[in-house]
């Protein structure tokens, strides 16, 4: 297909001996890395995205004779993950508690054939290294797009309406209407621009339409003309020309080498003073200190999102302490509904893997050593 092109290291990977795209016969060692549920693990039977829930596939895998190991311990040479790298066949991880799969780890993983992301976004994997090794990398495309788009809309409203200071007043026994109202705004009539209009970006634009906003979008490709007309969104080919027009900017582009650090001090300075930024894409798309400085200076009136770099965010991460933020841990795409969708998607791909069948084409990030074009 046109979307697949050989990665630069693909021929090298083939020369070194690529890994099988489909499973060979016999029992497989499958390792899952998820966040720990702890005291919350047994509070909801559908809470399958945690270590204890294990995506709800343990009984199914073990009934087929496979070995399934699940952990949240993923960092360092003495981690639980590291103990299993050399002989695991499949690694399942998640953007919400990512196991960073470096070229070094791929080199150690002699039996590794398949890397699955339970959710969307596989930038925790060194994709060129995976391609060079002939691996397959796939994710559950579409599994949490609604979840993330809804969360983005929520954060836009939280920041525009200056909700968080009001909430804090109530918690601390205070009452000062002026301290909230002096910078609270309606969403109606504002110009909202999304950087990226893929599945999540389009869903956000559709949800913004009833608010009577002026909607702009920037992407490599224009969305379908009929949908564009239905939503009432205008395409902006030049990102830097779009930014000064926007009262609200939402980041919906994947993290690639082209987008890493995309929003630096200079680009943020091109935005309208007092802009609201929402980023549920990836933290590394932003220059961390530039965002914190812009929030402190007032160039950015509010910054919200659930993505950080690195993750989990260290205690001294500047975004924890910058003014006017609406930051949370990485939660937008791991609602219970999303967990059930991406758990089902992982099970489906594992079943296809065991049977030697292809995955849904949209799920592939690297297919048998070939990197999807958008990650080139």
UniProtKB/Swiss-Prot annotation:
First and last residue of the signal peptide: none
Reactions catalysed: formate + NAD(+) = CO2 + NADH
Sites where the protein binds NAD(+): 145, 199-200, 219, 254-258, 280, 306, 330-333
Entry GO terms, CC: chloroplast; mitochondrion
PROSITE patterns in the cross-refs: D_2_HYDROXYACID_DH_1, D_2_HYDROXYACID_DH_2, D_2_HYDROXYACID_DH_3
Subcellular location: Mitochondrion
EC number: 1.17.1.9
Subunit structure: Homodimer.
HAMAP family per UniProt: Formate_dehydrogenase
UniProt-recorded name of the protein: Formate dehydrogenase 1, mitochondrial
Organism: Oryza sativa subsp. japonica
């Amino acid at each position: 297909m046109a979307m697949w092109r050989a990665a630069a290291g693909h021929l090298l990977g083939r020369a070194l001996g690529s890994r099988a795209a489909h499973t060979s016969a016999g029992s497989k060692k499958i390792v899952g890395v998820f966040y720990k549920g702890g005291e919350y693990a047994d509070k909801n039977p559908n809470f399958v995205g945690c270590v204890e829930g294990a995506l709800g596939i343990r009984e199914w895998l073990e009934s087929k004779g496979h070995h399934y190991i699940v952990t949240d311990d993923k960092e360092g040479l003495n981690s639980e993950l590291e103990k299993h790298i050399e002989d695991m066949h499949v690694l399942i991880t998640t953007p919400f508690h990512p196991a960073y799969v470096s070229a070094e780890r791929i080199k150690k993983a002699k039996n590794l054939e398949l890397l699955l992301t339970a959710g969307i976004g596989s930038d925790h994997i060194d994709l060129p290294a995976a391609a060079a090794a002939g691996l397959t990398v796939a994710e559950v495309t579409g599994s949490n797009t609604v979840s993330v788009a809804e969360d983005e809309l929520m954060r836009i409203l939280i920041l525009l309406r200056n909700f968080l200071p009001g909430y804090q007043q109530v918690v601390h026994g205070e009452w000062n209407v002026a301290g909230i109202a002096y910078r609270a705004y309606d969403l109606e009539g504002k110009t909202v621009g999304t950087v990226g209009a893929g599945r999540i970006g389009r869903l956000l634009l559709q949800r913004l339409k009833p608010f009577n906003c002026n909607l702009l979008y920037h992407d490599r490709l224009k969305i379908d003309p009929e949908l564009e007309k239905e939503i009432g969104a205008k395409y902006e080919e030049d990102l830097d020309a779009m930014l000064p027009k926007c009262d609200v900017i939402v980041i919906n582009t994947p993290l690639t080498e082209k987008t890493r650090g995309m929003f630096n001090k200079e680009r943020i300075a091109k935005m309208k003073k007092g802009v609201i930024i929402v980023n549920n894409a990836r933290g590394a798309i932003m220059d961390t200190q530039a965002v914190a400085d812009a929030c402190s200076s007032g160039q950015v009136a509010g910054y919200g999102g659930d993505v950080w770099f690195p993750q989990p965010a260290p205690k001294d991460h500047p975004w924890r302490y910058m003014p006017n933020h609406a930051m949370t841990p990485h939660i937008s795409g791991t609602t219970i509904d999303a967990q059930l969708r991406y758990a089902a998607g992982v099970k489906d791909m594992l079943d296809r893997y065991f049977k030697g069948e292809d995955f849904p084409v949209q799920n592939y990030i690297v297919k048998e050593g070939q990197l999807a074009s958008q990650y080139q």
